[in-house]
Structure formats: C-alpha cells, structure tokens
Amino acid sequence: ADIVFPIHPRTAKIFANFGISADNLHIVEPLGYLDFNYLVKYAKAVITDSGGITEETTVMGVPCLTLRDNTERPETCDIGTNELIGTNPDNIKPALDKLFAGEWKKGTIPPLWDGKSADRIVDILVNL
C-alpha cells in the first residue's frame, strides 16, 4: 500500500538525515485544508498523533489510528471511526492488520455533527 506523508520541512530533513525511505512512501509538503481533506477522503486509513483530524475521518467514514493514549474528542472513538492505539510503535502493525482484514469498526457521525449548528444557534438566539 502506498503511504502519503504530508510532512513539515524540518521533519523531512530528519528523515533524510536518517536515510528513511521506502518505494511506497511518498513524502509531500504540508497541504492546505481542502487538499488534505481530499487526500483523507480517498485514503484507506489515516495514522495520526493529532486530535483534530479525527473529526474529519469520522465524518468521512475513514478509519483513523491515533497514536495517543487519550483524546479531546472521545466521540470519535465512541461512535466514530477513530481508535486510540497508544504511543507504542508495536501497536501499529496489529491495528493495520485488523484494518486490512476488514475488522475495523464502522463508525457513525455523531448526532449533532449534522451541519445544522448555525440553525440551532439562530433558533436559540431568536427565542431569547
């Protein structure tokens, strides 16, 4: 499987210094929000240490492996496509094996993530 890794230039230098490369590893410069979300939409999965992207993966139905022990967005784990796999690198392969075997959970979009927040806010303000 191809791996696309949007990476900060400083981190890219570290990769180069250590000689980290692989034929299926495509290191690209950081992407803008829309380009990044396009990449996420067509990804088999996302591996991240960020809390924010877990919202996008949940909405898009893309499996997300989060390299953390906790999250500020527990709903992405509870009903979304996100799973906390911890900070031990040895946890990545078993999680990917589960994913590629078709055993990853099928998440749903949280009820209030329906794109109607502004309508609800206006209704509340109008009725004050």
Residue positions per predicted region:
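Nucleotide-activated sugar donor-binding and catalytic core shared by glycosyltransferases
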Residues: 5-128
